[in-house]
């Protein structure tokens, strides 16, 4: 039976995504108080902010305990990858967001690639490398054009889509030997460049149960006409018509079901957002990437579409 208690909520993060979450949570009749840490100049017009860095997870846990928050929502991936979810749960504070063993799906693209292969989930052909010479050999001999990905977190900027094999080799060496992306580039994923249209599928997950939000599409290239380097996202829209009912059925059957079953087999009690980036290819949707939080900018176009109470859905994910 759902409690009618008003909830004091802490949202962690400082971007447009967190502002969208603030505005959505504020619509909840169950809200009793709201703070965003660290927030930003726009967010502080809509709720109280606290000057605590999103990656200072010990300070966040201390602040949440001292101020008796009933619920914490982590916006970005970095706090989750550092174990914010684990530390809050250990302190008895409910949180929306996976534990560290779930957040590794985004924190390590190499882990994610191995996970996809292990559970036969459709994705691009590819291989993980820590040695630049081995990576070059693979790139030059591959029967397909390649994409080079830093394995670790890089704020959405760790993917290089080269125009030639020489560019691909240079990108791989820059990551593995030149220090591009720091520790995040010490291991890379070299994979087939897939052809098709991308879409972002956001799931709100509780173990083997989930709610799928409308498909969205973000545009990552920095330049006009979809040119230049990838960014975390230059803009987005939703719903994305390219994700037809047939595509979404295939996503549910061939991607979501084996992913959630695989997480359970790996001992992961996943509770939070799972973002599945897909490429809609001629042979069906394939996984481009996993993220363990709402996309930014996608969250900014999804939250205004939500008619249900976001806080209630998040609480249901947490409670099972």
Model-identified regions with their sequence ranges:
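General beta-strand structural signal in soluble alpha/beta enzymes
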Residues: 11, 36-37, 73-74, 95-98, ...
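Peripheral (often C-terminal) accessory segments that flank ATP-dependent C-N-forming ligase machineries
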Residues: 315-320
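Short acidic-hydrophobic, aromatic-tinged amphipathic segments that line or gate anion-handling sites
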Residues: 49-55, 127-131, 162
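Short, charged, surface-exposed secondary-structure boundary motifs
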Residues: 44-47, 61, 104-110, 223-224
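A conserved helix-loop-beta module that forms one wall/lid of the active-site cleft
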Residues: 96-158
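ATP-binding N-terminal substructure of ATP-dependent carboxylate-amine bond-forming enzymes
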Residues: 1-100
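Internal nucleotide-binding/catalytic subdomain
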Residues: 158-300
């Amino acid at each position: 039976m759902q409690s009618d208690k008003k909830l004091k909520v802490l949202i962690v993060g400082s971007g447009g995504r967190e502002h969208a979450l603030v505005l959505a949570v504020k619509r909840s009749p169950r809200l009793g108080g709201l703070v965003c840490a660290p927030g930003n100049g726009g967010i502080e017009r809509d709720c109280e902010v606290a000057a605590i860095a999103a990656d200072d997870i010990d300070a966040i846990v201390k602040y949440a305990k001292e101020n008796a928050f009933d619920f914490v929502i982590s916006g970005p991936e970095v706090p989750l990858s550092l174990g914010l979810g684990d530390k809050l749960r250990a302190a008895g504070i409910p949180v929306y967001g996976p534990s560290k063993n779930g957040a590794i799906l985004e924190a390590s693209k190499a882990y994610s690639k191995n996970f996809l292969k292990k559970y036969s989930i459709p994705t691009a052909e590819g291989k993980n490398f820590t040695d630049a010479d081995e990576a070059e050999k693979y790139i030059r001999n591959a029967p397909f054009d390649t994409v080079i990905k830093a394995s670790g977190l890089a704020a959405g900027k760790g993917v290089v889509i080269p125009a030639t094999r020489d560019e691909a080799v240079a990108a791989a060496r820059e990551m593995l030997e030149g220090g591009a992306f720091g520790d995040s580039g010490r291991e890379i994923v070299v994979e087939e460049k897939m052809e098709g249209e991308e879409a972002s599928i956001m799931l709100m997950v509780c173990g083997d149960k989930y709610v799928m939000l409308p498909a969205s599409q973000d545009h990552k290239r920095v330049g006009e006409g979809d040119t230049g380097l990838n960014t975390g996202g230059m803009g987005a829209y939703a719903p994305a018509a390219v994700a037809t009912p047939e595509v979404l059925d295939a996503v549910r059957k061939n991607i979501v079901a084996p992913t959630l079953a695989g997480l359970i087999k790996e001992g992961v009690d996943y509770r939070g957002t799972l973002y599945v980036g897909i490429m809609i290819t001629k042979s069906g949707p394939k996984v481009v990437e996993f993220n363990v939080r709402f996309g930014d900018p996608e969250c900014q176009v999804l939250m205004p579409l939500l008619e249900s109470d976001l806080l209630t859905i998040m609480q249901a994910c947490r409670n099972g």
